[in-house]
Design a protein with these regions (language model features):
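An acidic, low-aromatic, low-complexity terminal/linker signal
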Residues: 1-130
């Protein structure tokens, strides 16, 4: 929650695609009069891609220091705070390709909730041509 600024729903047309970008970078969008990159988070994490037939996107705006990103996701169900003692290592629980982008995971009944590491997402080599 420390890095989350807002969860919003935006029309697909509000994202302007940019040429020669990795597939996970959808393009640029306007958020509160600021131009920010929109990222297809499932694509970036090698998960199931967004439904291309959508008319609107669910976006989670994150800020890490001075960097703002719009993380586009399939669905936003809500937010939950967890006690630190409930957070477990994701190693062995999820695909190894996801681990660098996670702070941990929480086991809840029949599902594993993944806690994203916003700093790791922003600093990902996938998003930078350095």
């Amino acid at each position: 929650m420390k890095y989350t600024q807002e969860a919003i729903v935006i029309p697909v047309e509000s994202i302007t695609s940019m040429p020669n970008m990795p597939p996970c970078i959808l393009g640029l969008m306007n958020w509160r009069s600021r131009i920010i990159w929109s990222i297809d988070l499932p694509e970036m994490l090698n998960l199931e891609s967004l439904d291309t037939r959508l008319h609107q996107y669910n976006a989670i705006i994150i800020r890490v220091e001075s960097v703002l990103l719009g993380l586009i996701v399939q669905e936003i169900i809500g937010t939950v705070r967890f006690m630190p003692d409930l957070i477990r290592s994701p190693v062995g629980q999820v695909a190894s390709s996801l681990v660098p982008y996670l702070r941990g995971c929480v086991m809840q009944e029949k599902e594993i909730l993944l806690l994203l590491d916003a700093r790791a997402i922003v600093q990902s080599s996938i998003l930078h041509n350095d």
